[in-house]
Design a protein with these regions (language model features):
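Glycine-rich loop-to-alpha-helix module at the N-terminal edge of alpha/beta enzyme cores
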Residues: 46-108
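Terminal low-complexity tails and localization/encapsulation signals of metabolic enzymes
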Residues: 1-49, 82
Length: 108
């Protein structure tokens, strides 16, 4: 199937053609190796492929969350707040890329 690319739309793309799951701080291929096409309403064509996760992937994510919960629970509220503020700063620095992704995904 022909893919819609930002290049086809005259825009330089900061995005990958395929996205895996983000589990335990790293990108992980779906256990069954399956992906689905993310269709953009702009053209009705696939924009990228995204991991088609299932219960096995969810179990891996839950295991990672359970592993991280103890350390997070021991983190002071001040340090947690600083981490969340850093996340907000990174999102703000990448607002154009995020809004472009939302536009492509939603068609407006």
């Amino acid at each position: 199937m022909a893919y819609t690319t930002l290049k086809n739309l005259g825009i330089k793309s900061p995005y990958k053609e395929k996205y895996d799951n983000f589990i335990g701080g790293k990108w992980v291929k779906p256990v069954d190796g399956r992906y689905f096409e993310n269709i953009t309403p702009i053209s009705g064509k696939p924009f990228c492929e995204v991991a088609r996760s299932n219960e096995k992937d969810i179990e891996l994510a839950l295991d990672a969350a359970h592993t991280a919960k103890d350390a997070w629970g021991k983190t002071s509220t001040t340090e947690r707040a600083n981490i969340l503020l850093k996340i907000a700063d990174v999102m703000e620095q990448n607002l154009e890329i995020i809004s472009l992704a939302e536009t492509i995904d939603n068609g407006k």
